[in-house]
Amino acid sequence: MPSHSRSRDRYGGRDSDREARYDYDYARRRYATDDNDDDYDDDELEHGLNERRYRRDGYLPPRESRTRGYYERDAEGAADEELLGDERNPGPRASRSYGHDYDARRGERSRAREAPRRSERHRDRDREGQSRRRAYEDDGRHRTRDGRRERGRESDAEARRSRRREAGRETAARKHQSSDSTNSASHLLSADALARLGAQYEKEERRKRENAKDAAKAERKRQKKRAVVGEESRALRDPPGESHRDRTKARVASGAYLEEGRSPEMQVRHRGGGGPAMEARWRKEGSWGGTMDDAGGGRPFWKRKKWIGLGALILILVIVIPVAVVVSKKHDNKSDPADPQGTSPGKSNLDGLSHDSIPAYAQGTYLDPWTWYDTTDFNVTFTNETVGGLSIMGLNSTWDDSARPNDNVPPLNEPFPYGSQPIRGVNLGGWLSIEPFIVPSLFDSYSSVAGIIDEWTLSKRLGSSAARTLEKHYATFITEQDFADIRDAGLDHVRIQYSYWAVATYDDDPYVAKISWRYLLRAIEYCRKYGLRVKLDPHGIPGSQNGWNHSGREGVIGWLNGTDGELNRNRSLAVHDSVSKFFAQDRYKNIVTIYGLVNEPLMLSLSVEDVLDWTTEATKLVQKNGITAYVALHDGFLNLSKWKSMLKNRPDKMLLDTHQYTIFNTGQIGLNHTAKVNLICNDWYNMIKEINSTSTGWGPTICGEWSQADTDCAKYLNNVGRGTRWEGTFSLTDSTQYCPTADTGPPCSCANANADVSEYSADYKKFLQTYAEAQMSAFETGQGWFYWTWRTESAAQWSYRTAWKNGFMPAKAYAPSFKCGDAVPDFGNLPEYY
């Protein structure tokens, strides 16, 4: 609503006594808002509290409406340019709060400066123009006049006290001399007693006078040292109860405040508690710890209480911390199967060693164990020896290949009967090659605007902290306990992912170089300990072989493709040259039994001929370097029937690796529960059996990836920020739901699939286990399988570990409850929409 016209003549002589009333109101307000005043004032604070209540409710009485709050001045009373905008030039936010345009408001402010209103009710408007404020010199005259008035009042008070004392003495004397029974006690006081009473009275009066002087002195000192943030300067303050309508809440420059030691005021503003205003409120509510006659001279009770509480807290910490450390150490020495990661890395094998044992040129590098996040089970004796240009630092010089995972499998030092006994293995996805849906916690803290979608962007964003962050992940996400559990689950092979930056980085690569190599070597030693054989699988190749996030960099395919396609081709061969020389050592011949070339090259986009030529060259290279393991190549997402005629003149000991999922195929994800099991046992069973044959198909074939997930609901599964086919949010242009009840209802939801496993019904668990066991049965018609993946942070249907521990995976992988050919069980009342 527009303001009324502001005219001096409208109020006639109302200003004639304004100055006198201002002096009284100003002094009264000083008393009522004194920071250290312990009196129970009930005048202006109640108005302020009511006003704050109206503000919270979005309403202020029209006559008191204000659009601005804090207005701050420095200690000298000058406007602080860092804290305040020009009140005559409000910022965009302030201007938008008005109901009319800026030019109209500017004109109205001009009229206000020319003819300011003198109404008491609108005194805030009188102060809008800078020219309307009292000058500093005028305020000095007011202070002088205030001082004279204050001294006069003190003299009058002292005179009144003297008259009261004299009257008291005369009354006591008359009562003592009177014989009237109403003025007499049983025994009249003696002269000595009267003298003592008089002396006591005089002593009490002196104490009161001294307290009054001390209080006045303290008040003068407080007025001189009044804080800028706590209260405005007197020089430019508004009249009592008034403030400027056009003032916005000031921006607090925190740096300046902290430099001046005023951080407590910052806390008051941020949290809305404490400070002079709240202290006054506490006094009014009877919560103030001071006393009425302590005049603010002593430490308030609430401050003493704070220090008492702090002391008690310190005492508790002194007792609790040593106990917690002891308990923590005991816990660290016991692997917790439910959460084997622990809270701190182990470095006990550095005890008693000197950092000087590391040559100066190696200190601070990846060869320096004092820089490692975790040294558990690493050999920390320094060596700069390499094989194929790759460091052996961390390895022990001896090894033992006598272990076996179970009685159905030969020990490592005996050949595995590939072709007659299926592989039953698991992947370590998302560990040494980061994948967002497996470890979403590494990506959750970034907004979609930041574009952190893969290991490339994550490493680039982390910058200098990338090495520490990712090494912590390497050290804690997969530990020795995981390999023990893999063995106990009846598994016998592990497919370990790594990427080229474990070996080398190029150009502007932001990846953390070489650290994951050390954890790859330790993982192989853990596999050795538990009798598990290893398939090596490079998930990230220079340039990216598919443009997906698990290749390291989502986007363009730069391997065998584009401007740097040939360069990255040669780089990928150089990586295999180094890696194959390293794993051709005798210590790995019994354990690294399958050597992968590249994970999921997207042959639907790449030249098939170029990929096959590279595959042949890479296979010959690694075999020339001494690799005797089977060499695995991926089907490139081509129809398996096409592979019947491809690479017929290939090198020996090669395996075809196929990855099978129902959830990424819109024709399969919408099948109901029973139909999915039938699809596996009919179509997939025969497909794998056929391609695995050297006479009717390609030859030895493994399924390197599959899962029991029957939806694509897992967070980040379809890329960071992408929706799902199941709920119809995957495509930006198509909202079709691909689920069994999409046409009939109810609509499918990811809530049940993504729920905590403790909420899974018995029927749902039965389906998930049957669905998994059907796939095991189908893939075992070939060379066997590797489940994707062993562990995830939250995607339960992708974690063999979670399913195994929660009863929807067979207790032993080699002893399933269901096989293709068995009758598909009844899944009870399991709804089809999840």
From Swiss-Prot:
Reactions mediated catalytically: Successive hydrolysis of beta-D-glucose units from the non-reducing ends of (1->3)-beta-D-glucans, releasing alpha-glucose
Cytoplasmic topological intervals: 1-306
Extracellular-side segments: 328-834
Region spans: Disordered: 1-188, 200-251, 331-354
Cellular-component GO terms for this entry: cell surface; extracellular region; plasma membrane
SUPFAM superfamilies: (Trans)glycosidases
EC number from the UniProt entry: 3.2.1.58
Biased composition (Acidic residues): 34-45
InterPro entries: Glyco_hydro_5, Glycoside_hydrolase_SF, Glycosyl_hydrolase_5
GO BP annotations listed: cell wall organization; glucan catabolic process
Comp. bias intervals (Basic and acidic residues): 1-33, 46-76, 98-173, 201-218, 228-245
Keywords: Carbohydrate metabolism, Cell membrane, Cell wall biogenesis/degradation, Glycoprotein, Glycosidase, Hydrolase, Membrane, Polysaccharide degradation, Signal-anchor, Transmembrane, Transmembrane helix
Compartments (UniProt record): Cell membrane
Residues bearing carbohydrate: N333, N379, N384, N396, N549, N561, N570, N639, N672, N692
GO MF entries: glucan exo-1,3-beta-glucosidase activity
Keyword Cell division carried by entry: no
Family matches, as Pfam families: Cellulase
Active-site residue list: E600, E705
Transmembrane segments: 307-327
Primary location class: membrane
Membrane topology of this protein: Single-pass type II membrane protein
Record-stated family: Belongs to the glycosyl hydrolase 5 (cellulase A) family.
Function noted in UniProt: Glucosidase involved in the degradation of cellulosic biomass. Active on lichenan.
UniProt name for this protein: Probable glucan 1,3-beta-glucosidase D
Species assigned in the record: Neosartorya fischeri (strain ATCC 1020 / DSM 3700 / CBS 544.65 / FGSC A1164 / JCM 1740 / NRRL 181 / WB 181) (Aspergillus fischerianus)
